[in-house]
Amino acid sequence: MSSNECFKCGRSGHWARECPTGGGRGRGMRSRGRGFQFVSSSLPDICYRCGESGHLAKDCDLQEDACYNCGRGGHIAKDCKEPKREREQCCYNCGKPGHLARDCDHADEQKCYSCGEFGHIQKDCTKVKCYRCGETGHVAINCSKTSEVNCYRCGESGHLARECTIEATA
């Protein structure tokens, strides 16, 4: 993802805080190496060109992008001279305003990012998963499986940089 793309929807022309997809949750198209890709069918399609819901930019009649703050063309929201329009924060789970995901009444629709099951979120998950071996029931620090570790300081295997006896060069 480039630095001029929105972290919520992955589109350029605005920042995440001005994203027309709404409050805290984006579409999560890019996982940035963390293994998470969220796409919700419960959220309406919002055009990043005009900021209206019900269609995507590829189907928009506008020829140029509109500012998400004032709705006029010729500039983007971060450069808008109008006062910033406040957007109500929405639940990450259902997309509705007025509550946070942890307080959402739609708990049966919540999907855990760790185990993939519905009915709870990651912080409440009882099935911890080790990122080293991929097994459930323990975390990496308690993993009995040995893995080849490499030192970032000297490049040798078998130890970490904090255990390296080679002097660091600046």
Curated annotation (Swiss-Prot):
GO terms for biological process: positive regulation of cytoplasmic translation. Keywords: Acetylation, Cytoplasm, DNA-binding, Endoplasmic reticulum, Metal-binding, Methylation, Nucleus, Phosphoprotein, Repeat, Repressor, Transcription, Transcription regulation, Zinc, Zinc-finger. The modification N6-acetyllysine is found at K8. InterPro entries: Znf_CCHC, Znf_CCHC_sf. The modification Omega-N-methylarginine is found at R25, R27, R72. It comes from the Eukaryota. The modification Phosphoserine is found at S42. The keyword Glycoprotein does not apply. One of its GO terms (molecular function) is mRNA binding. Coiled coil: none annotated. Arginine methylation by PRMT1 in the Arg/Gly-rich region impedes RNA binding. It is found in: Nucleus; Cytoplasm; Endoplasmic reticulum. Associates with the 40S ribosomal subunit, the 80S ribosome and with polysomes. Single-stranded DNA-binding protein that preferentially binds to the sterol regulatory element (SRE) sequence 5'-GTGCGGTG-3', and thereby mediates transcriptional repression. Has a role as transactivator of the Myc promoter. Binds single-stranded RNA in a sequence-specific manner. Binds G-rich elements in target mRNA coding sequences. Prevents G-quadruplex structure formation in vitro, suggesting a role in supporting translation by resolving stable structures on mRNAs. This is CCHC-type zinc finger nucleic acid binding protein.
